[in-house]
Amino acid sequence: MTMHRSSIGQTLAPSLAVSCWVQGEPIDLSQLLGHVVLLEVFQVNCPGCFLYSLPQAVDLHYRYGDQGLVVIGIATAFEDFDKNTLENLRSLIDSGRVIGETLRMLSEHQQLQNGRWPVRLPFPIAMDHLIPADNKVTPDAVESFIQQKLPDFTSQPIAQQNRIREQTTAYLANLQYYAETFERFALKGTPSQILIDKQGILRYSRFGYDSELEHDIQDLLNESVS
């Protein structure tokens, strides 16, 4: 999987915007000062989330939970809104039922037992808050979206910039919802991992499976709180 990492480390993490907590008690990030927080952002219809990122998050939860790591799962939706639903999230949590491309890929990789995903997610899980999109696409909205998602946009060839504008315009015109937590953290896709330090500072955001995630968690756990 392609992985994009960014180090931030200057501002407090924004608050979570969720429609409901499907597993565990409601959590406010301000309650977790003194802990290192891993936000594992996924979609139900995201094969890579289930093949790589979610199993990694489960492993980290078990190995570092007693050292001060708190893992929170955020199910989001920025596409495939008929599949990335609260109902399908509940079915996943309750019975391991998977759907769509996730079902197909897990089956191909022989990761299912009796047609179900056998991995139990042991940490709190919430559904991102979805806001209906108005689909009024303006040039300013297109440029703002591109700059947020593609910081190197202006370095692209002009022909590529024009193609990106056309694709973005079509995407926004057909967008059904905005996922509020996904947008607050300026994420680029799923799976995404967000690391927040003991002082509530947003330290890292990365898109795709990241083999360095454990090392970064260890570093944050070892930091002293000033």
Name every feature range the model reports, one short phrase each:
Residues 1-30, 162-170:
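N-terminal "domain-start" segment that seeds a small globular fold
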Residues 2-5, 111-113, 179-183:
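Short, P/G- and charge-enriched loop/turn segments at secondary-structure junctions
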Residues 14, 47-48, 55, 124, ...:
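Proline-centered helix-kink/hinge sites
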Residues 15-38, 58-64, 182:
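A short beta-strand-turn-helix
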Residues 27-58, 70-75:
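Short active-site neighborhood of thiol/selenol oxidoreductases, capturing the structured segment around
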Residues 52-142, 155-156:
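Structural microenvironment flanking redox-active thiols in thiol-disulfide oxidoreductases
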Residues 144-226:
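Thiol-/selenol-based redox modules, centered on thioredoxin-like
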